[in-house]
């Protein structure tokens, strides 16, 4: 494996000099901040327990503040449903008994509750939707009855499974009507969430978050100031800037535009972050998303150039787990203007754009300089272990993580073992 150069003082100074300040009025937005430190969140996929063989117990919980469990599906009438009942609550792990009395949850639900018990600062959120299952959001959000049904069924899963909040991943509201309905949907979830907390968990604050786009065509349709008021966090999906859908090779998750090579930077994170803040989102509610994977391009002369095909991948064409990178024979290169790494093999002419630990350090310095809320990663199974972990690198760079406690009391869970706190 190639070793990456540590970030120098000069690089940090150059980064700080590059940053432009958002509008002061929005930097100082008057909002209630419940977290007592930075978020270091990661999406955990329920399909990851299969071929990827990544189980809840494999999470390095000491590095993580929020596990976002994905994904739940939803129906057109707003009903939230499990996308995989076996992975979610049926699978028996090695330490699960087949002779338990009562109705009990197993699978990832029980395993994540065990992780919560052992790590009281780690919160688990239920993520609904995602790219594949966003089709029914417009209908689910379109009427008061559907919104109420969505909130009711989402919160039922949250309390039955012993989770600490709800994450909505609607990709993406397509127009002003859908954007307005999204706010109404979030407000309904918040209202029912708070009513549940008042009755069953007095004083506890269940979280409400979304995954949000970094592409202007998508976020320009959103009601940013309203999102900033109703949500605890906005997890900015600051990746997938280039890929098989692109006409030319490009950076997957660059911080800035590169004027000398604009073809390599069709999108950039800094523009999105500034637009969200200037649109009325409190900076400390923006969590900067980072990829734990790389996007590949074949038969290319370099970044911002033509290519022919994306090749294979770890699990799908053109996408490689970070733990498989850099590939043998490739040289890691850095675009110091765009702030983005990529590997290139001059013999095979394959280019892969991905975030290195050094890039994570740069991004954390960036988010801290703007007063953002922390880091988010997609997704847990693709990380390396030990010192090369990007999640761990983010933890070390952030410093003080949020340590607000999770909840272990769910007196009306339908599962006896969750109701009893696995005691």
From Swiss-Prot:
Active-site residues from the entry: 171
Biotechnology remark: The antagonistic activity of Trichoderma harzianum is used for the control of several soil borne plant pathogenic fungi.
Glycosylation sites recorded in the entry for this protein: 218
Residue ranges annotated as propeptide in the record: 23-34
UniProt catalytic activity: Random endo-hydrolysis of N-acetyl-beta-D-glucosaminide (1->4)-beta-linkages in chitin and chitodextrins
Residues noted as binding chitin in the record, renumbered to the chain: 102-103, 129-132, 172, 237-240, 378
A GO-annotated cellular component: extracellular region
Signals that turn on the gene: Specifically induced by chitin and is catabolite repressed.
Temperature dependence: Optimum temperature is 45-50 degrees Celsius.
MF annotations from Gene Ontology: chitin binding; endochitinase activity
Enzyme class: hydrolase
Principal subcellular localisation of the protein: secreted
Domain GH18: 38-401
EC number: 3.2.1.14
InterPro entries xrefs: Chitinase_II/V-like_cat, Chitinase_insertion_sf, Glyco_hydro18_cat, Glyco_hydro_18_chit_AS, Glycoside_hydrolase_SF, Glycosyl_Hydrlase_18
Role, per record: Secreted chitinase involved in the degradation of chitin, a component of the cell walls of fungi and exoskeletal elements of some animals (including worms and arthropods). Plays a morphogenetic role during apical growth, cell division and differentiation (cell wall morphogenesis). Also acts as an antifungal agent. Involved in the degradation and further assimilation of phytopathogenic fungi, namely mycoparasitism, the major mechanism accounting for the antagonistic activity against phytopathogenic fungi displayed by Trichoderma.
Protein name listed in UniProt: Endochitinase 42
Origin species: Trichoderma harzianum
Gene: chit42
